[in-house]
Structures are given as structure tokens and as C-alpha cells.
Amino acid sequence: MKKVYDVIVIGAGHAGIEAALAAARMGKSTLLTTLEKAGVALMPCNPAIGGTAKGHLVREVDALGGQMGLSADEALLQIKMLNRGKGPAVFSLRGQADKALYHDVMLRVLENQKNLDVLYDETTKILVKDGVAHGITTLENGEIEGRAVVIATGVYLNGRTIIGAETNSSGPVGFKNATHLTDNLLSLGIDIRRFKTGTPARIAKDSIDYDEMEVQEGESDIGTFSFMNDGNLYSQMPCWLTYTNEKTHEIIRKNIKRSPLYNGTIHGIGPRYCPSIEDKVMRFPDKTRHQIFVEPEGRDSDLMYIQGMSSSLPKDVQEEMYHSIKGLTHARFIRYAYAIEYDCINPLELSSSLQVKRIKGLYSAGQINGSSGYEEAAAQGLMAGINAALYVDEKPPFTLNRDEAYIGVLIDDLVTKGTNEPYRMMTARAEYRLRLRQDNADLRLTEKGFALGLATEERLKKMQERREEIERIVRLSETVKIKKENGGIFERYEGVQVEKTMPVKEALKHPGITFDVLKEVTNAFSEFSKSALFSAEVMIKYAGYLEKEDAAIRDARRLEEKILPEDIDYNALSGLRIEARQKLSKIRPATLGQASRISGVSPADITVLLIYLKTAK
């Protein structure tokens, strides 16, 4: 191939797809390379998009002009709002997706995207000259020139699947793995480590006793992922809930020496927040049962995904423990659970733009950066694709702060703190989560996406109309009154007596009073959409907390605005402790704010850096 591309993306999983689409939509000639067509947008583990904090990421990717939310909506089987009892900051959409349909939808999007070519071939080498990436070498097509390269190889680098004593050199689901690129990355001086993840068995749907399980229905009035879609999902498929029991746990304990996780076969580090069933049983011996969700893999699929039963135990043990569970007594295995080990890079090698610090024009996104999850991958892929396109145009990188998006928290955590295990996004990681709700992702990010040339004019207009609608609701809430004679709603929904007339805005400060409740006493808000009413209600109800968050954000930004020179010699700053010098020299933070978040850098060290910046002027 002789064509010179602006951007080359390696890997067509959730990160690679977003990276390639972002670059192409920003007008860059883009090549997406991947091992095989069947692996495009593959969902090798759970048949779901979203979840706690992950739903926020999907909404943010969508708000910026990414693809995951739109494609997920086309493939939805069921959708739910998680964390309803914990407050609006952590409300998170989670949708069951038809795996085959999601693959088909993404393939169609890629094939129809202007400026984008797709090549099915293995990348063996990143071409680098004088510290600058300038293309790739592939197994069958040789050298391909490119001005920027994005690595998004997922779990395919030297992938090895493990079931008991059986090990296979392969990617997920028995797909081909990539066996050449790791050596090239090592030769470029990039720090490589070995991580592990796993997946449960897939069971034939006609072999499950559903009557012995608890049915789990979706919700049909909560909208979907993309801000571009206004409707609800009415035709939904159920999931089911069952539990492990003492017999299950005894089978696991009896066979624990045959577990690759416990007998030394597996060397990779696994995810803390998605442990295998044997790990859960051994780590939490006091728990008498663990939740197991049985989820469909597609409308026309014969496979059911057994969430919560990830394992690498031998096949005979898997059959015994699955058959001990209510509803799975006659379960027929289509695919056994397995663990997979893979190579990934130390994310401390990256800057906040996801560019490899030592190689200009080389970016990295997704599970190769040590993260886990489809949504975390998509978010990184989008940002890497944006920044690769900006790099080609010789424009400054685009980054998001921790107070602007969960995407900002995710990337800052990876490149500042690093990770010793597969990193999972959680709401607890975000300091400003009341400001970073999933319902306002469009208000926070769509203008930024439009300025980049990524979000469309139609998307921008839709966001502006929704923002104006929210502002009208807030203004109206100041003038519409709840009359004294309607005070009974406070007694019904709060158990308190209120005997005075008050504006709706004041009434909403009461925890039990919502716009939904207020329908009983006023129709002044009947013209407004449910999503706008929810966003306005949160703004009104939590105004005091939001003001406190804004003050904290202003304080944090003072440190973020203080830029640290790239060539600063930390070893020459005598006031810094040895650990701080070592960490600062390795990570080379861009700002004082980033430096303050590095493990091992104390407030006293930050004071030393502040003094240095003042005297250096």
C-alpha cells in the first residue's frame, strides 16, 4: 500500500472504532487495521453497555460526537437506571445489547464513513524515526505511512486463554491474537506489563429453568443512551436473577488447587472489581451466596451470559458448580468460562493527550492502557483519535479536566497515578460527581465537540434547545406558586405539614417533592420534556451543593493553571523528598494540579514547586 494516511488506528474494538471515526469525522484520511472482520466491535464479555459510572462515559462520548451511544441504542434488548436510591449524581443507565447486532451496526457505520479505510491485517511494527511515529508495518501489506498512529489493541497482544490446565495462544472467543507488536513496543523503550481478565460460561437458553429464578424486567420510560434519540425502548427482553449457594462454594473450595488463579498458571494481574467466582468465594468466606444474573446475548441468539460466574476452573468443575445453582441444574454448556492474559503498557508512559511521551505522534487507547471495560475503552479511543487528528494539523491537544467529565477523571487517573490492575471507572473516583451527572453530559460537552468538528450542527441545536427548555423551567419555578390549600402533598410525600403558599422552586427543596409529584397540584409544567424537567429539578434541589462544588473547582483550577516546564530538573530541587523527585521525574506532570495527585508527592513538595515557579519567573 503506497497511500500516506493522516491517522492509522491499530485495532477495531471499542477504543479503535471511536479513534478512527473521530479522526475521519475531523477530516483526516484514516486507516483502521484489525486482525479479522468478525472481531470488529466485538463484545467478548458481558452483553451490556453502561452501568455505574460507565453510563456516564457513554453519555459523554455521545455528547462529544462519538458513536457508542448511537450504536448501543440500535442494539438494545433492555435498559435500566441503576442507583435510583443513591441520588441523581450516581444515576447510571445500563443496557443489555444484542452482540451480533451491535457488531453489524458498527461495521455499517465504519463502511459508510467518509475518509476511512478498513484493512484486515496484523500490525507487527510501529515505524519511528528520530522519536516521531510515521506509520506501521503489517504482516501482509508491508509498510504503510501515516502521520499519526493510535494503538488500540485491547486484549490481543500475546493473548493467552486459560481453562484449568488448558492454555491456548489466542485472543478472546478463540480469535487470532497479535504476536509481533509487543517486541516492537519493548524495543521502543515502552514499559510493558501483563494483566488478566476473564469471562463466564455461555449456556444454551433452552437448558435453563427460568421458573426457578427471579425475573428482571427493564424500564420503558427512561429514554436511551444517545441525546440524539428522544424515544423510549418499549420492546424489551427480560433477564433473570439467581444465586450461588453453600454447595457451589464447597465445590469451588474442594477444587481450588486446580484453579489457574491459585496454582500459579496465571501470572497476569486481574481486575479487583470484577473478580472470578473462585476469587469471590475464597476472599469472602462469610458470604453464603453471590448474585448471578442470567442475560440474553441477542434476540436470535441461543446463548445466555451468566454474569457473576467468571472463572478459569477446569471444565468438569465448571459443570459441577453451575449445575449446583438454582435454575442452572440442567445447564448445557456452549462455551466454557475462561481467563485471558494479555500485554498492556504502563499508562504512566502517556501524557494527558494519550500520546506516548517518548514518541511524538504515537497515541494509545483502551485496554492496552491498563483499563477494563468497553466504555472506558471507547472514551479513551475518542480522545486519542481527536488528539491524533489535532496533532496532524499541528494544533494543541484537547484534554478534559476532572471537573469537566468522567473522561477527564479516567485519563487523569491513568496517566497520573498509573494502575497495577485493570482500571475500572467508578463514581467514587470523581470529586465533582454532582456536576458530572449523566443527564447533563450534553450541556457540558457538546459545544466542545462541535468546536472540534466532531459533533454535528444538528446535535448542537438539539442541545441548545434542551438547555433553553431547562432555563425556562427554572424561571417558571420562581413564579408558579403552590397554594396553601394544596399543602397536603407535603404531608403525603414527606409526612410534614406545610401551611403556606410557596414558589415551586422552594417546594422542590423538600426531598420528597418532585416535578412528578407537583403534577397533582399544577399543570404549569406539562409542556416540558421529562429529561429537561429532571435536569432542572436537580439544579434547583441541589443548588447549595452545586455552589460548594463550584467553589472547590475554582480552588483546584488555581493549581491546574500553574504550568510546570517540560525540562524541569526535579533532582536539582533540594527541598523535594527523594520519593517525590523520583515520581515527578518519571511522570513529568504538566501542571501543579497534576503533580498534587501523584501518589508519593506531599503538600510540602507542592509548596517547593510553587516557590520554584515563583523564583523561576
Where are each of the predicted segments found?
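Beta1/beta-strand and adjacent pyrophosphate-binding region of the FAD-binding site
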Residues: 2-15
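Conserved N-terminal/central alpha/beta ligand/cofactor-binding core
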Residues: 4, 21-125, 140, 152-172, ...
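Short hydrophobic core segments
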Residues: 10, 143-154
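An anion/pyrophosphate-binding glycine-rich loop and adjacent beta-alpha core
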Residues: 36-38, 182-319, 416-511
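Internal hydrophobic alpha-helix adjacent to the cofactor/substrate pocket in enzyme cavities
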Residues: 377-398
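Extended, charge-enriched "interface" segments that sit outside catalytic cores
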Residues: 429, 446-605, 611-617
